[in-house]
Swiss-Prot record:
One of its GO terms (cellular component) is virion component. Induction: Expressed in the late phase of the viral replicative cycle. It comes from the Viruses. It is found in: Virion; Host cytoplasm. This is Probable dual specificity protein phosphatase H1 homolog. Its EC number is 3.1.3.-, 3.1.3.48. The active site is at residue 110. It is an enzyme of class 3 (hydrolase). Disulfide bonds: none annotated. One of its GO terms (biological process) is symbiont-mediated suppression of host JAK-STAT cascade via inhibition of STAT1 activity. Belongs to the protein-tyrosine phosphatase family. Non-receptor class dual specificity subfamily. Homodimer. One of its GO terms (molecular function) is protein serine/threonine phosphatase activity.
Amino acid sequence: MDKKSLYENVLLKSTGALPKARVPTKMMRVTDYVYLGNYNDAKAAPTSGIGFKYILNLTTEKYTIKNSSITIIHMPLVDDEYTDLTKYFDYATTFLSNCEDKHYPVLVHCMAGVNRSGAIIMAYLMSRKSKDIPAFMYFLYIYHSIREQRGAFLENPSFRRQIIEKYIINEHKLKLFG
């Protein structure tokens, strides 16, 4: 997408009223090999037809899927205002980049597929953004696009703030003072 289209898209979405959040009902393909979903999507992953190699489980519940070759990586995160996600961003974004590079389909999920998984997906996409696009604009574009498709995305204000601080404010400070 060119800059003009991106700016227009973000401005139109940002100036309209956001619809009330609703629980997403189906898994979403975020990139060629990275998917966003919920707990039910994870349990149904072996029969999804996608051929998942990995599941990144961000719930506090550790589980296995019987008769499946999918590797489940458990990063137990709590969906509240006190959880510090920033210490997980680098590991998760590197892992997802490696899956993308090796063409390994991976499902990122939490219980509802909204906050914890939404934050990790947003961090991953922000880590891969083009240097030509301002970080704040890209953040808004992703946020509105995914929220529009899924009905709810990254609703936890603390998680949004942590992503904004790491990928927008800190990046801006580096450009100004680095």
